[in-house]
Curated annotation (Swiss-Prot):
Note: All late proteins expressed from the major late promoter are produced by alternative splicing and alternative polyadenylation of the same gene giving rise to non-overlapping ORFs. A leader sequence is present in the N-terminus of all these mRNAs and is recognized by the viral shutoff protein to provide expression although conventional translation via ribosome scanning from the cap has been shut off in the host cell.
Biased segments, Basic residues type: 34-45
Superkingdom in the source lineage: Viruses
Stated name of the protein: Pre-core protein X
Phylogenetic lineage: Viruses, Varidnaviria, Bamfordvirae, Preplasmiviricota, Tectiliviricetes
InterPro entries assigned: Adenovirus_late_L2_mu_core
Keyword terms: DNA-binding, Host nucleus, Late protein, Virion
Subunit field text: Interacts with the core-capsid bridging protein; this interaction bridges the virus core to the capsid.
Amino acid sequence: MALTCRLRFPVPGFRGRMHRRRGMAGHGLTGGMRRAHHRRRRASHRRMRGGILPLLIPLIAAAIGAVPGIASVALQAQRH
């Protein structure tokens, strides 16, 4: 039986998910696309300010989640 546990950690500099606005009123299609591309570039730069910790959190969570599975396989191998 698998048990999943979710933990929340405050990460300085991380503001959550960015919501994309649909429809640029008063702008042409190409103008809206240029602005959206420019915003994405800024958002990726903003994410890097938090350092390497936001990149490590999903890896640590995956490793913690894999521990029960690894332990059960080890126990089964030990029994056989």
